[in-house]
């Protein structure tokens, strides 16, 4: 439960919007969705296919959520609110498994039958976070795709 820190203007704007919602005097909860992937959102698959090369050290932990799980979490929380259930101020919309980017890309490349290329595109990702969906799960939400493996496998079939 570390506090959210904004590393960009966009992040600052999002935190300010969350603050406005939570201090509005109206019932509100914030849902922070991690990297959304799914049908039509295949950027990492395309980067892996192009030979993306991600060093193992230092590990860049990433969090993601399948599009269907993101929608399912929102629907679940809205249904709870409709039943007058008390919601937490903030939920993290992530799958069960924060993973190092090199592991995710390596797994995708293995599934695609391609290899990382020495001159392939590199990661421009900054930061490294391990987020937990424990609070969302405690509310009764269960992701259909608990890790990147199940989610991306469904896209690659």
Give a label for each model feature.
Residues 47-57, 114-118:
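A short C-terminal helix-loop "cap" of Rossmann-like NAD(P)-dependent dehydrogenase/epimerase domains
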Residues 14-18, 42, 98, 102, ...:
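Short, surface-exposed alpha-helical segments at coil->helix boundaries
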Residues 30, 64, 98, 130-131:
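Short aromatic/basic micro-patch
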Residues 13, 30-36, 43-46, 56-78:
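Substrate-positioning beta->alpha
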Residues 124-157:
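C-terminal amphipathic/interface module of NAD(P)-dependent oxidoreductases
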Residues 1-6, 36-40:
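Conserved catalytic-site region of short-chain dehydrogenase/reductase
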Residues 71-73, 80-127:
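Mid/C-terminal beta-alpha module of Rossmann-like enzyme folds, strongest
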Residues 5-29:
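Active-site Tyr-X1-5-Lys
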